[in-house]
UniProtKB/Swiss-Prot annotation:
HAMAP family: PlsX (MF_00019)
Keywords of this entry: Cytoplasm, Lipid biosynthesis, Lipid metabolism, Phospholipid biosynthesis, Phospholipid metabolism, Transferase
Protein's UniProt name: Phosphate acyltransferase
Pfam families, per database record: FA_synthesis
Organism: Klebsiella pneumoniae (strain 342)
EC id: 2.3.1.274
Top-level division of the source organism's lineage: Bacteria
Name of the gene encoding the protein in the UniProt record: plsX
UniProt KW Lipid metabolism keyword: yes
Length: 365
């Protein structure tokens, strides 16, 4: 394994350095080839490194930042006033080549905007998308995007997400001819928003894509598709709902029947069943797949949940390591170029044509 360097926005997220710095030390313990640049307030970071040994400290560097982008800041305003912030400094380290990837639990909109501004999208990609690989009940994986980078998506963006998701499934997850579906409120062709229906019409015409139609949210964990595409609003709500249900289920496994008097053999049986079921469903624990990759950029950026705990943030760091090792941006760009040698131009949907015509008619004099 070759050495690699990551930039961490340790000030981002709900808990800031109290979670991100211990997670950084945990990541260093599990990867001897990793170097971390901790971007943030040195006065807040330094005390949390008191337990770090000499070897860990040799692979750590504090990069001072003057401010933090608030989680509730409007993205446009946050970007305008971002100079000197921990998030921007971390991204600039990637842009300058001092780090190979960035990890942040900060404001999603600001991270999306700054990453697009500083690292630039892959040629032909309109907007990057947040993507993650979720486990499903068949013990396989499903690539899901967008998870919140773009609240409103037109049909062209959805088609681009589908192509990028399929490439990721092939090049990184190792799937052959991955099935691609659009998340919708029903499987019938006339169901859903016009953007979804128009995207479906275009996806059917792409011979390089194994498009299988619509999928409903209750089938997310069934393994019926390899790539699931949706707008960022729907994807974010769907993901967090799923995570909440899984956390509740795992919590019930641990606490069911507590406080009730039972015979010793029933208690032993209950504990055995709880441990067995917990192991069986542990792969669904949201902490184990924290970290969404901002797909479509020329550099690697990982967005962690804002509410991530130490374990979850360390998983996001590992996601960044894998993104660098697997050369995700480079492989996505190369695959798109091979699929579309004349340029990544997609057929226009009816709504996109109408929208362009209306903007031309209603333009400024």
């Amino acid at each position: 394994m070759t050495r690699l360097t990551l930039a961490l926005d340790v000030m981002g997220g709900d808990f800031g350095p109290s979670v991100t710095v211990p997670a950084a030390l945990q990541a260093l313990n599990s990867n001897s080839q990793l170097t971390l640049l901790l971007v943030g307030d040195p006065d807040a970071i330094t005390p949390l490194l008191a337990k770090a040994d000499f070897e860990q400290r040799s692979r750590l560097q504090i990069i001072p930042a003057q401010s933090v982008i608030a989680s509730d800041a409007r993205p446009a305003q946050a970007i305008r006033s971002s100079r000197g912030s921990s998030m921007r400094v971390a991204l600039e380290l990637v842009k300058e080549g001092r780090a190979e990837a960035c990890v942040s639990a900060g404001n999603t909109g600001a991270l999306m905007g700054l990453a697009k501004l500083l690292l630039k999208p892959i040629e032909g990609i309109e907007r990057p998308a947040l993507v993650t690989v979720l486990p499903h009940q068949q013990k396989g994986k499903t690539v899901v995007l967008d998870l919140g980078a773009n609240v409103d998506c037109d049909s062209t963006m959805l088609v681009q997400f589908a192509v990028m998701g399929a490439v990721l499934a092939e090049e990184v997850v190792g799937m052959t001819n991955p099935r691609v579906a659009l998340l919708n409120i029903g499987e019938e062709e006339m169901k859903g928003l016009s953007s979804i229906r128009d995207a479906a019409a275009v996806l059917k015409t792409l011979p390089s894509l194994n498009y299988i139609g619509y999928l409903e949210a209750n089938e997310l964990l069934t393994g019926k598709t390899d790539v699931l595409v949706c707008d960022g609003f729907t994807g974010n709500v769907t993901l967090k709902t799923m995570e909440g249900v899984v956390r509740m289920f795992l919590s019930l496994l641990k606490s069911q029947g507590e406080g009730k008097k039972r015979s010793w053999w029933l208690l032993l049986l209950k504990r055995w069943l709880q441990k067995s079921l917990a192991r069986r469903f542990s792969h669904l624990n949201p902490d184990q797949y924290n970290g969404a990759c901002l797909l479509g950029l020329r550099g690697s950026v990982i967005k962690s949940h804002g509410a991530a705990n130490q374990r979850a943030f360390s998983v996001a760091i590992e996601q960044a390591v894998q993104a660098v090792q697997r050369q995700i941006p480079q492989r996505i760009a190369a695959r798109l170029e091979s699929l579309y040698p004349a340029g990544f131009a997609l057929p226009e949907s009816d709504s996109d044509v109408n929208s362009r015509q209306q903007s031309g008619t209603n333009g400024h004099d």
